[in-house]
């Protein structure tokens, strides 16, 4: 290639689009922080003993067009067939109004978890709708705002049953007609928490001495059975019963709640979310009100704001890992908010009648199929069903299955049987094609007429739903596309996302989610593949996954990867299981002590508790580093039982610890393993790596470092990388291995496979040099912000050369003592300036942790710094008595349009100062839609379902 062609190449175009500051601005920033060059800054920041000796070996960067062309080649290797496998995954139509306005809309997918409710009312409303939808359809009393998948929801239900129940048994019963992938995930959870799992026939449940039970309704083979009597008898034995159910089936079938179930779980996938080779999808959990404080996951509740107006918020957060740590109900952090929102909107758009029509059509097609097969001489395994039938095919099973494959049709193979699951996409032509496979000559139209005479004959009369559902106006209003489009936009406009400005959340890495990275996720070649389709039909996924694993191994210095975990917390869980299985394989299963620094993420101790580890906290010194003397003492005390240490690097204090290699060596010398939490991997890529540092296992947050969007609280992915000695202990899957020996942590082998293309695309378009440069720019941005704010705010931790890593912690505690203004007041006031708050009170109470990422440009960094400096000046006015502590722009923040237009203004500052505090806000303004939300009121008056329409009107 000539020099001119090289200079005109688009090969590295994406790097400049991903990184915020252009080269000239980087130079200005370096001068401002007194650094000679970017590389000099890195040398001052990252300890020399952990710097990589050689660049990463990765392919050269691709242009956006070249990346998409390569991605299309992966996609073409996948074969989209007509799939009737079922087993919890179904074809579905994603309404285009939802596809375009939600899934493909950065206003929805780039938002963060709604910890700041004043700027999150849109998605909070949608998630509340999700909860109401689940409550109504399952017949339960309270629901959460999504879990990772149906299988992990079942595992969470098991632990809920133990916490909430009164039985002294240590055995959990699982009916043998539960989805196989669910059974395996439950077995994994049970083994490491010390429970025994008993798999048996449903009929045997009442006679078992068990603390909890899991049953499937309809069953995995499609059978519909009345569970009322079995549930009552089990409960008489102090057994809490969980029913795994299907939301679409619940529109026609008597729901689990009306049969007396204690817990209902399942997947909302078929409500408009593509199968995606296994995910991501929103699972759900609903239970009785009395169990609400033992229920895992985020719960949206109704509260009021400072003016007494209705406002939504995340309720009962004291149950969660970021507060209760090892005593939390679960380690779940990231859930599936974006997918829950899609399912919620699907229900809003179709409404009760629309959903019932879809269910009737699906059931009618199934009834036609069943009638035709019966007339054709085939015997059904059961005559009651909703959308799934199982045919006794005996010796013909393999021949019929092969014939189906030849006709591009996927069926489910069972011993001596074939399963067929229909869905909303099933057509008359599909039924005719299925008849052809089985040699049935019946006419579909004639069968339809015959079946219509008793439309619900396959549903026992006692199991036909009579109760109403989705009666709230939100499910009965937005049924035209115009109405729906406007409703989606109204909710979107209430929320702050990356489309509005920087989200400087420390330890969250809210970087760019580029449009080019997002495009492939809606391609049918990725979306329409069933996770249990024959492997040859998913060759594209296999090739993509193999290449991504190789890239991640190179980036991390590990030898093997599993893509199965659906979140960072799930990755931690899989990693600790790998460590414990490794110890067991060496006859050292007694090693159960996990050392965790006091600065650790809340998920770390919560996860360690989930694998029955004893958590021992290691102190940090005044500089934010692990206290080496305390570590040595704790290792010595527990050396015989030491399993592992969980560290984060750079530490959650925002510094590169100089002695991290020494920490690893000390733990290894005592027979322990090192788990390096990958939450801060964005400050390692290309400069160092977990494997080089000396770690044995890490999870990576693909929704942080590798650009999968946060989605307002999920999806996420937490694949784990390991050194070779731990590779045999990565999670397996029932589809690939020996039943009972898989230690699966997710329902599908590749977890949330359909979003893997995002991370692959990011790595491909950045290349080695681009990835390394992104890390350097992230460090530059953080140090620039730190240096601009340091004259005004105390910075809590810095490295030995006065530098920070990719984030910095601002200490508000002395300022609060001086002025009376808290970190929460600053966080809320930042909303008036057009910003999402930094991370509050983590890892140190009374602080703000700022992470700008590499994607923010100099103008945005300056806008943020100017806002923070202006807020500091406002704090000084409070201190000096110009404004009273109980009435000033900070404690009254955020300000709304209603405040601006109110007739009375009883405040000692102007409306302009309150609502337009900076020059930037006068040219463009994001408006919070509620005043400060009352958290205490919300938890004391807990309402987790849609409020009356009158409340909206008020």
Swiss-Prot record:
<dbReference type="GO" id="GO:0030170">
    <property type="term" value="F:pyridoxal phosphate binding"/>
</dbReference>
<feature type="modified residue" description="N6-(pyridoxal phosphate)lysine">
    <location>
        <position position="704"/>
    </location>
</feature>
<comment type="subunit">
    <text>The glycine cleavage system is composed of four proteins: P, T, L and H.</text>
</comment>
<protein>
    <recommendedName>
        <fullName>Glycine dehydrogenase (decarboxylating)</fullName>
        <ecNumber>1.4.4.2</ecNumber>
    </recommendedName>
</protein>
<dbReference type="InterPro" id="IPR049316">
    <property type="entry name" value="GDC-P_C"/>
</dbReference>
<dbReference type="InterPro" id="IPR015424">
    <property type="entry name" value="PyrdxlP-dep_Trfase"/>
</dbReference>
<dbReference type="GO" id="GO:0019464">
    <property type="term" value="P:glycine decarboxylation via glycine cleavage system"/>
</dbReference>
<keyword id="KW-0663">Pyridoxal phosphate</keyword>
<comment type="function">
    <text>The glycine cleavage system catalyzes the degradation of glycine. The P protein binds the alpha-amino group of glycine through its pyridoxal phosphate cofactor; CO(2) is released and the remaining methylamine moiety is then transferred to the lipoamide cofactor of the H protein.</text>
</comment>
<dbReference type="InterPro" id="IPR003437">
    <property type="entry name" value="GcvP"/>
</dbReference>
<dbReference type="GO" id="GO:0004375">
    <property type="term" value="F:glycine dehydrogenase (decarboxylating) activity"/>
</dbReference>
<keyword id="KW-0560">Oxidoreductase</keyword>
<dbReference type="GO" id="GO:0005829">
    <property type="term" value="C:cytosol"/>
</dbReference>
<dbReference type="InterPro" id="IPR015421">
    <property type="entry name" value="PyrdxlP-dep_Trfase_major"/>
</dbReference>
<dbReference type="GO" id="GO:0005960">
    <property type="term" value="C:glycine cleavage complex"/>
</dbReference>
<dbReference type="Pfam" id="PF02347">
    <property type="entry name" value="GDC-P"/>
</dbReference>
<dbReference type="InterPro" id="IPR049315">
    <property type="entry name" value="GDC-P_N"/>
</dbReference>
<dbReference type="Pfam" id="PF21478">
    <property type="entry name" value="GcvP2_C"/>
</dbReference>
<comment type="similarity">
    <text>Belongs to the GcvP family.</text>
</comment>
<dbReference type="GO" id="GO:0016594">
    <property type="term" value="F:glycine binding"/>
</dbReference>
<dbReference type="InterPro" id="IPR020581">
    <property type="entry name" value="GDC_P"/>
</dbReference>
<dbReference type="InterPro" id="IPR015422">
    <property type="entry name" value="PyrdxlP-dep_Trfase_small"/>
</dbReference>
